[in-house]
């Protein structure tokens, strides 16, 4: 637990009478890339959203970047501090359509971190260069492709200089030919040592870039371990079936 960026023990989450997470336990270490996979409705996105308190757990223990997220009454200041250190990239990019790309990137650093406009602008431009979109600073989101929007969303998250990045199916809404450009940026971040938790259906990415993988099924962790080993030689019948449907071939 000493090197844990995220530690969770017996985590439960329900929506009304629907139990979504049923006693999930695990740990994500600093510098790791961990993929969370599983069929629709298994709870993977809900678990991810618990990691930056977009959802509050109903039971169990959850420590993220040293903060106890099982506490029911975190202050607004505590939540803002958490979300500054635990960035999130959503399936839908959620860029503000009436603002330029640059303004989308500088808004949170100015409002939350109290950065000066010049400082936030310089940082935003450097991260746009990092994701290969330096020339798009003055563009509006509707002038970008889906892949470009998602890369801007990643740059926006990086502008908060997070310790942890959460990705909720970042490529699932993209045309297949645009997926690669987003995964390339994510791979670069992984190589630089960013702690990343990725809910994904991109099994090749999970196998090649991920250190470990959690396979969720019906609200529980059915299998976990080294990403390449788990995805190449799954132990459970359910995971074998899932992978065969994802890849189109029998495993």
Where on the chain are the PLM-derived regions?
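C-terminal boundary and immediately downstream tail of ABC-type ATPase nucleotide-binding domains
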Residues: 216-218, 224, 228-251
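ABC family nucleotide-binding domain
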Residues: 2-227
């Amino acid at each position: 637990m000493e090197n844990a960026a995220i530690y969770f023990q017996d985590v439960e989450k329900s929506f009304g009478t629907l139990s979504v997470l049923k006693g999930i336990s695990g740990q994500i270490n600093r510098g790791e890339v961990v993929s969370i996979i599983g069929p629709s409705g298994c709870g993977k996105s809900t678990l991810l959203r618990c990691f930056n308190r977009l959802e509050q757990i109903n039971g169990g223990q959850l420590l993220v970047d040293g903060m106890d997220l099982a506490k029911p009454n975190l202050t607004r200041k505590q939540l803002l501090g958490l979300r500054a250190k635990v960035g999130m990239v959503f399936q839908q990019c959620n860029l503000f359509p009436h603002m330029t790309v640059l303004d989308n990137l500088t808004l949170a650093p100015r409002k939350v971190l109290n950065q000066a406009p010049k400082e936030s602008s310089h940082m935003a431009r450097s991260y746009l260069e990092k994701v290969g979109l330096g020339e798009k600073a003055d563009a509006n989101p509707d002038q970008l492709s889906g892949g470009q929007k998602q890369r801007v969303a990643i740059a926006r998250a990086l502008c908060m200089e997070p310790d942890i990045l959460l990705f909720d199916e970042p490529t699932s809404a993209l045309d297949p030919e645009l997926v690669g450009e987003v995964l390339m940026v994510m791979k670069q971040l992984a190589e630089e040592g960013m702690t990343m938790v990725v809910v994904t259906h991109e099994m090749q990415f999970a196998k090649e870039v991920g250190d470990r993988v959690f396979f969720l099924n019906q609200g529980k962790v059915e299998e976990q371990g080294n990403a390449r080993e788990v995805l190449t030689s799954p132990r459970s019948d359910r995971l074998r079936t899932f992978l065969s449907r994802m890849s189109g071939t029998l495993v």
